[in-house]
């Protein structure tokens, strides 16, 4: 059995508003009645402007998301909202949502098919516990804002029990495996990517965003063992919608699309946090790899003239555009298949790097 209470409030113009709230027990309904009566006696009770989840989500994105999210976070959260939140609970009244509702919702999600994507091309997989945790993170933040805006009295996601999940442990290469891959590598871009991932512990987006003004590979620097790369930006593919909606300060430039109908663009952007900016010293042989790249690039620029679009990128195509991360990953997969190495992702090379440095330093890095 459920219990309902109708709340009445007069606007400044004399218009009366009625809002219905549902409760699972009479005790909850009576408690809420006392809270409302107390707030009304103080003149602080305000009928929320948003009554449904979809209305709240819209306000949340417009006010909070546009101010707090970067373009990549916007893409991820909007995907969760459009795929899993609005279609399932968008029409639900805010007054009906409590801890019990949230726990049942999370449980029900695990029985629903996941939306078709690059990771689920055949749309034959169910929503995972990991995705439910991501959805919970968005809703918890959304409901926190609703409480702050006096649209809800409490956050129903705060104490909700989530489905258990264990993060998948991915295999990583040993330093010896990475050296084997480098020795077998015939692609110059993959080779320099391997070297920088290991020596400078860079992510693939940071690698693609490296520019010549952020390295010191001079003869003097190399001879004194102080050649370095300074990591302060990255290349990332994001939706055009995110760029247009956010007008984000983190975006330094937008690379031109090679296809007119693309829904995504590549951008050069600042890192996620200030702590991601770092100066990393590199060995002389890695500096020499960059010198060779620079020499070849300068020759291409001279030959092409105005046809070369100079973004000052280290990892640049023949015409100056940033190299695609997918190209690096494809080349890496060829080496993996050829050498029979464990099937790892490029990001795992950072863990290989950190593990090796910890071993060398005895845990002091």
Predicted regions located by residue number:
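Short, solvent-exposed loop/turn segments that connect beta-strands within catalytic domains
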Residues: 1, 10-16, 118-126, 218-226, ...
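N-terminal DNA-binding module of tyrosine recombinases/phage integrases
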Residues: 2, 10-104, 293-310, 321
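N-terminal core-binding DNA-recognition domain of tyrosine site-specific recombinases/integrases
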Residues: 21, 25, 61-149, 167, ...
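Conserved hydrophobic/aromatic pocket- or pore-lining residues that grip, position, or stack substrates
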Residues: 85, 102, 139-142, 150, ...
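Basic, Lys/Arg- and aromatic-enriched nucleic-acid-binding interface segment
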Residues: 115-119, 123-129, 133-135, 148, ...
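C-terminal catalytic core of tyrosine-transesterase DNA break-rejoin enzymes
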Residues: 130, 148, 195, 199, ...
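Short, contiguous acidic/charged loop-to-helix segments that flank catalytic cores in large enzymes
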Residues: 169, 184, 268-277, 316-324, ...
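Conserved tyrosine-mediated DNA breakage-rejoining catalytic core shared by Y-recombinases
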Residues: 177, 210-299
